[in-house]
């Protein structure tokens, strides 16, 4: 699969550039020399996003429509299982490759980016790390092709950031576990064929009593809530999962009883690299849009790009974007080298998400009234960016993580 993915780098045909929103990148990646394989991957993903995602992004956003055909094609390219070993039908690539691909896909369509991110890092990731050989065959291999996707159920209506306070319970009963409770804000909920769900097996132990389970979808005893009508990433479904005495086999347990909180936290570390990369893609798309518009729009007898006020905005946007990209790549490379990366992933996610929010804001400002209408992609980028500061750990949580590691390093 990895060989197929990289071979196609030279096979996709470039489309014509679009007038508002897609600019060829010439210097953005020159700050770090990427390996040739990663450069090929980047070009493959960029061409795919240009050809398959950018043209449909506005429509799927408007219709709240899951991009099923595009996700299937991404599966064929290996993008839905990038870090899965080839023996399990994955691409067998590293996390730097995953970050690069996530940015390019999200640059074309942020909704498609988060669909890809959840399947790769939140669903497949914990099963690869903590699952048995049998679980990997059952729950990983069928989810690599784009035909099936998974989701991740940690948050609840009464808790989001406090993951250890799960009200959902899993009760042992003979050869089964019985799940009861409601999970909230579940990305991919309506399209998913399986979920990694976290529930309390011993409430007296708080986070040490949380366990993780693998559950097929749809299934009796599991009801989907309504699709949330969201501000952004509207082509990706978000809904509650309601478990009503859902009975699952004992071998549905992922890892050991009480290991769920550790599984969740380690999974979110990797997920934050994915969301940081999604934010980079949104920010890059907004910068593309702003520069294209400013070069073609005249004021006071000259293009907007001749105005110092606009140049200052563009400089600040580029600075924030490239700084966040380097932090994100650093976190990915630390993970690839099996070094601690929790702090760096939090820094990357914080920097990239806040950069995306700021850059999309300034892009709208540069476009003026044209940035406020749906004929231009700037308003969609603005809407899509906001969630990156909330899901997979709010900006406030990221600051707590960074500060905790910083203070610990000074005290040691």
Curated annotation (Swiss-Prot):
Sorted UniProt keywords: Acetylation, FAD, Fatty acid metabolism, Flavoprotein, Lipid metabolism, Mitochondrion, Oxidoreductase, Phosphoprotein, Transit peptide
Cofactor binding: number and manner: Binds 1 FAD per subunit.
Catalytic activity: a short-chain 2,3-saturated fatty acyl-CoA + oxidized [electron-transfer flavoprotein] + H(+) = a short-chain (2E)-enoyl-CoA + reduced [electron-transfer flavoprotein]; butanoyl-CoA + oxidized [electron-transfer flavoprotein] + H(+) = (2E)-butenoyl-CoA + reduced [electron-transfer flavoprotein]; pentanoyl-CoA + oxidized [electron-transfer flavoprotein] + H(+) = (2E)-pentenoyl-CoA + reduced [electron-transfer flavoprotein]; hexanoyl-CoA + oxidized [electron-transfer flavoprotein] + H(+) = (2E)-hexenoyl-CoA + reduced [electron-transfer flavoprotein]
Keyword Oxidoreductase appears in the UniProt entry: yes
pH dependence: Optimum pH is 7.1.
Subunit structure: Homotetramer.
Molecular function GO terms recorded: acyl-CoA dehydrogenase activity; flavin adenine dinucleotide binding; short-chain fatty acyl-CoA dehydrogenase activity
Protein name: Short-chain specific acyl-CoA dehydrogenase, mitochondrial
């Amino acid at each position: 699969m990895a060989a197929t993915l990289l071979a196609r780098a030279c096979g996709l045909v470039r489309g014509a550039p679009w007038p508002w929103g897609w600019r060829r990148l010439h210097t953005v990646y020159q700050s770090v020399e990427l390996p040739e394989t990663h450069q090929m991957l980047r070009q493959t993903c960029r061409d795919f996003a240009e050809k398959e995602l950018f043209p449909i992004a506005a429509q799927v956003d408007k219709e709240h429509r899951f991009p099923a055909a595009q996700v299937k094609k991404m599966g064929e390219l290996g993008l839905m299982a990038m870090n899965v070993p080839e023996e399990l039908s994955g691409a067998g690539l590293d996390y730097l490759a995953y970050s690069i691909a996530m940015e390019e896909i999200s640059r074309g369509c942020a909704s498609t980016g988060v669909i890809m991110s959840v399947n790769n890092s939140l669903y497949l990731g914990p099963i690869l790390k903590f699952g048995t050989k049998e679980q990997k065959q059952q729950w990983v291999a069928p989810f690599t092709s784009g035909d099936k996707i998974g989701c991740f159920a940690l948050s609840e209506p009464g808790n989001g950031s406090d993951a250890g306070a799960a009200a959902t319970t899993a009760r042992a009963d003979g050869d089964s576990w019985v799940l009861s409770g409601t999970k909230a804000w579940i990305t991919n909920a309506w399209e998913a064929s399986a979920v990694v769900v976290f529930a309390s097996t011993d409430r007296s132990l708080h986070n040490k009593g949380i366990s993780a389970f693998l559950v097929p979808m749809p299934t009796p005893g599991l009801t989907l809530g309504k699709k949330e009508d969201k501000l952004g990433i509207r082509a990706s479904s978000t809904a509650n999962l309601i478990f009503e005495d859902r009975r699952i086999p004992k071998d549905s347990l992922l890892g050991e009883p009480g290991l769920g909180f550790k599984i969740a936290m380690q999974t979110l570390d990797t997920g934050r690299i994915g969301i940081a990369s999604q934010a980079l893609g949104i920010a890059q798309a907004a910068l593309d849009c702003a520069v294209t518009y400013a070069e073609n729009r005249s004021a006071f007898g000259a293009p907007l790009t001749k105005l110092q006020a606009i140049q200052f905005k563009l400089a600040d946007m580029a600075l924030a974007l490239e700084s966040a990209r380097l932090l994100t790549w650093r976190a990915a490379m630390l993970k690839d080298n099996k070094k601690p990366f929790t702090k760096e992933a939090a820094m990357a996610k914080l920097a990239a998400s806040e950069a995306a929010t700021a850059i999309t804001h300034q892009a709208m400002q540069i476009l003026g009234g044209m940035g406020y209408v749906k004929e231009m992609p700037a308003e969609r980028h603005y809407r899509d960016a906001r969630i990156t500061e909330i899901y997979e750990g709010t900006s406030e949580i990221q600051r707590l993580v960074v500060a905790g590691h910083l203070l610990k390093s000074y005290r040691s």
